[in-house]
């Protein structure tokens, strides 16, 4: 049996992969690890304490905030602010980016963007949820307050990205641009242990993930692609299997392991799409590309899009290389 490696050991071991290695990024990832453990503990008590359900307020997107959304947001912010690597965060749950103004954070080199609890509306029915994070080097001068430009960087500028999935087991999956690795939380040890090394997605899959309840509102190209997935064509393993949980992290994680495509296109009610470029699409795209897949808005690479606002939305197609290319073909041939 190979020797078990913890997340902390793995981070230190890989520190030399960074051209500007100083230990800062390693410490930042350790902060995320700590916050994930705290949130995981609370999620596991969600049915026993008064932390499920809505709080009666909406976030900047007009979505009802859940108690655990705010709890996770506070815990991740606190963990990141407590060390000197991060000068500010932008969160799906915050209207504006938050600058850390303590003396401790004055010379910080990084900003973090996050969806602190993706799929939180599923908590009450015990469906897996997750945290998504994205890390950039700031572009404003170190020693000054962070600016909007620090957060509005294209995805190809990310130095690290990852997600935590809180499910039957809790996993942290991340990349720093040198492959994708997954760590499973061992509650008996209180630590994450390397369980999925060098994760790669197959070029072809048999799963397509989309909310087909919105079918009538989809672009023609997406409708035709869904029909393509359902056709009986044994020569290329069709029909595909439809699997949709409604939690981005959960659907993405399954497809990453098994091969498949996740689709969240534009609709008549959301012509720009519904998923957020900065908090969801860019970090997931970075992970997918590092695992050998593709992430697209249907016409261009997700990580080439230059953001114009913090809560910008985009259509999102991510997964096995050949499957994403195929849906792009359908969209190109069937422009509404």
From Swiss-Prot:
Keywords: Carbohydrate metabolism, Cytoplasm, Hydrolase, Magnesium, Metal-binding. Pathway: Carbohydrate biosynthesis; gluconeogenesis. Belongs to the FBPase class 1 family. It comes from the Bacteria. Mg(2+) 1 binds at residues 92, 115, 117. Substrate binds at residues 118-121, 211, 244, 262-264, 274. One of its GO terms (biological process) is sucrose biosynthetic process. This is Fructose-1,6-bisphosphatase class 1. SUPFAM superfamilies: Carbohydrate phosphatase. GO terms for molecular function: fructose 1,6-bisphosphate 1-phosphatase activity; magnesium ion binding. GO terms for cellular component: cytosol. It catalyses: beta-D-fructose 1,6-bisphosphate + H2O = beta-D-fructose 6-phosphate + phosphate. Mg(2+) 2 binds at residues 115, 118, 280. Binds 2 magnesium ions per subunit. HAMAP family: FBPase_class1 (MF_01855). It comes from Vibrio atlanticus (strain LGP32). The gene is fbp. Transmembrane segments: none annotated. It is an enzyme of class 3 (hydrolase). Homotetramer. It is found in: Cytoplasm. It holds the Pfam family FBPase. Its EC number is 3.1.3.11. Its cofactor is Mg(2+).
